[in-house]
């Protein structure tokens, strides 16, 4: 019985997918909830462009799913910028620089 169980567990380990771990040194995802007309969103876009930082932008007026995500955050106002688990409401270059530095950017 023990031998059968051991054989099963070994075989199962051969066919089960390996766990996926974050790559060492991988940077946190940067996401911004924004609108096309928001002046602070424009400042954040320019900041990301100047520094060559890749980010995901979600226009909360054009994307239903994006608006639902924004609402689940309990957000008010734009932009809302996420750097991994850290959140910033509005735009402050100093604060965003610190969040990005803490995330390895």
Residue ranges: model-predicted function:
Residues 24-51:
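Local sequence-structure signature of Cys/Sec-based thiol-disulfide redox active-site neighborhoods
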Residues 11-13, 23, 59-62:
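Short glycine/proline-centered loop/turn elements that form peptide/ligand docking sites
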Residues 78-89:
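A short, hydrophobic beta-strand/beta-hairpin element that forms part of a small beta-sheet core
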Residues 35-42, 60-64, 90-94:
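Soluble non-cytosolic domains of exported or imported proteins
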Residues 53-66, 75-78:
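Thiol-based oxidoreductase modules, predominantly thioredoxin-like and allied folds used
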Residues 1-8:
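Bacterial N-terminal signal peptides that target proteins for export
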Residues 94-105:
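Thiol-/selenol-based redox modules, centered on thioredoxin-like
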Residues 17-19:
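N-terminal signal peptide c-region/cleavage motif recognized by signal peptidases
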């Amino acid at each position: 019985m023990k031998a059968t169980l051991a054989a099963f567990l070994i075989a199962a380990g051969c066919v089960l997918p390996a766990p996926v771990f974050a790559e060492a040194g991988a940077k946190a995802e940067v996401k911004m909830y924004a609108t096309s007309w928001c002046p602070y969103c424009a400042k954040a876009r320019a900041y990301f462009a100047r520094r060559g930082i890749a980010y995901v932008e979600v226009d909360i007026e054009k994307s239903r799913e994006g608006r639902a995500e924004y609402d689940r955050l309990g957000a008010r106002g734009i932009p809302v910028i996420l750097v991994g688990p850290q959140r910033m409401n509005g735009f402050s270059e100093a604060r965003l620089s610190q969040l990005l530095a803490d995330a390895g950017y």
